[in-house]
Amino acid sequence: MAASPADASRRRREKRRQLDARRSKCRIRLGGHMEQWCLLKEQLGFSLHSQLAKFLLDRYTSSGCVLCAGPEPVAPKGLQYLVLLSHAHSRECSLVPGLRGPGGQDGGLVWECSAGHTFSWGPSSGPKSPEEPNLTPLPSTDERSWCPEAKSGQEPAGLESNCDERAQEARMPRGAGPPPETFPSLGEDGEEEEEDEEEMLSDASPWTYSSSPDDEPDVPKPPPSPVTHALKDGEIAPAPAAVPAPLASPSSSASSLGSGAPGPVEVRIQPELRGTPQADQQTEPLASPGSQAQSALASAWDEDTAQIGPKRIRKAAKRELLPCDFPGCGRIFSNRQYLNHHKKYQHIHQKSFSCPEPACGKSFNFKKHLKEHVKLHSDTRDYICEFCARSFRTSSNLVIHRRIHTGEKPLQCEICGFTCRQKASLNWHRRKHAETVAALRFPCEFCGKRFEKPDSVAAHRSKSHPALLLAPQELSGPVESCSSILASASLGASEGSRSTLAPQAPILLP
């Protein structure tokens, strides 16, 4: 049994009410805050309002910052303590420690060098008291010596990086040498800071050595220069251009040794080179630091600049007229790239993107047009009006709808000046002009204006061109009375079909 029209209309109204209720839940009324909302969406880089709303919900519900997800930064004290431990290890061992892995106390990291010296460090760790050392002390010896690997001539992994750094410094531009090492000032404030640093190092350093009774009292000796360990057989020592001149003077070195501060670089290099057979060969380049250093930098700079070719001058693209060679297409392009793009998407792969809906069957030239079309088959409405919170499937529909609130009518008819908001309204209006022009078959011979009926033409003549109607009649025929002319004019205006005035007999008045 078929349902009655009343039941069908009732079900239709119920479905419409449910649809409106479901859509109203998705609307967000921003009121007067629409400008701030759009500005925030552009700053965060979201293309849809729903993405911004999802981001704000996630940020509100999350415990931490959404944008700053990741591990917490390490405290400066922890990093300073790590540098302190590494420096203390370098004073006693020339090998560079590497990360062995987690396993220290409180989940810290364990560092170990090739000689077996280990120490642990954690991000939250700091300097501890000497009673609780956190490092594995070195075995006590009667004489301070280097590790077996360094003695046997095996170069550790850390020294290879030093050689690479020196090679990179040799390739630097002329006059832009490596930055000199910064040494503490030798004034009273500098001496106090150095003494405090030595005390911290002695407290934090677990590597203690016991000297023999015949040796002199334990005086803090300066750490050996890495230059002496990086030298190999036949290798020339680098010029001490980075060592400041005041630090190379004997008076400054004597004052620094008396105050307990580490001595300058030259004081550390000379004693070790004195007993070797290569000392005489290596002290000669050290005596003249300016000539060889500048020549090495100059040669390296010339080699680098020679590899760089002349500046490339880019030529402008030629302007030419390239017509499309497909039959029936008269498009002309000024660039071959545009022509190839036109051929590919307008002729070769013409409408290769088809709609997946079986009942639709539409096809498009570009994939982006297909994506916009697929939205019409779904109920996805990502574009929301900022004035009334209505949602739309495409951005073009939102732009047209927004003109209702702004009052903008950018489209105008070129015939009568009619303005409208969307192209469909303008096309419908232009059809009226086309139909009207086809229906006006009777023109006026004086001004060219067209009318639908001949009666309208006669009325137009008598109203708009009365003088032009009288002039031909005076030149063509005999004398006529004024009353006959007026009578014929009124008769033509009333009947409409008679456009010419024939001569009539005079009317006799009683």
UniProtKB/Swiss-Prot annotation:
Bias type Basic and acidic residues, positions: 163-172
Pfam families assigned to the protein according to its UniProt record, in alphabetical order: zf-C2H2
GO CC terms, sorted: nucleus
Record Gene3D superfamilies: Classic Zinc Finger (3.30.160.60)
Acidic residues: bias regions: 188-201
GO MF entry, a single one: RNA polymerase II cis-regulatory region sequence-specific DNA binding
Post-translational modification: Phosphorylation at Ser-464 results in loss of DNA-binding activity.
Low complexity biased stretches: 237-265
Residue positions where Phosphoserine is found in the record: S161, S225, S464
Top-level taxon in the UniProt lineage: Eukaryota
C2H2-type zinc finger segments: 322-347, 353-377, 383-405, 411-433, 442-465
Keyword Metal-binding found: yes
SUPFAM superfamilies tied to this protein: beta-beta-alpha zinc fingers (SSF57667)
Residues covered by region (Disordered): 1-20, 121-306
Amino acid composition bias (Polar residues), ranges on this chain: 278-297
Chain's role: May act as an transcriptional repressor for PCK1 gene expression, in turn may participate in the hepatic gluconeogenesis regulation through the activated AMPK signaling pathway.
Protein name: Zinc finger protein 692
Source lineage: Eukaryota, Metazoa, Chordata, Craniata, Vertebrata
